[in-house]
């Protein structure tokens, strides 16, 4: 049930455009952007895990997780830095973070079934020191704050497909990110629905591009592009403090 090694898990229809074109005007509202859809998905995956031990899909594949962890190691993100996984789903990325030594990890999802699934998988792995919370990232609790690193692998994509005013929800996402991420903190996003240029525009208020991560390329009809966009943003601010 896992996704391919790179690219797409099958949960969100890819809308990456070749260079020079935009997918922003091509989105069609979809049930894939609704809470009801994801509740149903994770209720089904929870039953499957309980019956067969199958953890479910790995969002964008294992390589997407490895890419993010390699970046964190390359830039010497402290192992005790606070990390937030936005839309954690089955929590498999949380498991990988722990395996690589990270110890201050929080996973959130607005689907209670997703959090139940994550908790079951973490219990099977013998992990009890990870924070799991049912949280709507568009309306986060006041306790959700002060993170050094925030990670998104598909949640912003899903929000973009919401039938109920997706444009405003994307703006609210950026506001929420600004609230929960510390000044000079890092935001790592992987998207199949948005190009680099579109993500730069979406997160231009309060964030700056720190690095673009390499992802597989494709070519079609003489034009080229990436199967996914993977970017690292840093939150702007006046503080000169680094993660410590």
From Swiss-Prot:
What broad class describes the main subcellular location of this protein? cytoplasm
Q: Which GO terms describe its molecular function?
A: methyltransferase activity; protein-lysine N-methyltransferase activity
- Report residue spans for region: Disordered: 1-27
Q: What is its EC number?
A: 2.1.1.-
Localisation per UniProt entry:
Cytoplasm; Nucleus
Catalytic EC class: transferase
Q: Which domain of life is it from?
A: Eukaryota
Give the family this protein belongs to, as stated in its UniProt record.
Answer: Belongs to the class I-like SAM-binding methyltransferase superfamily. EFM4 family.
Q: This chain belongs to which protein, by name?
A: EEF1A lysine methyltransferase 2
Source organism: Mus musculus (Mouse)
Lineage of the species this protein comes from: Eukaryota, Metazoa, Chordata, Craniata, Vertebrata
Q: Which gene encodes it?
A: Eef1akmt2
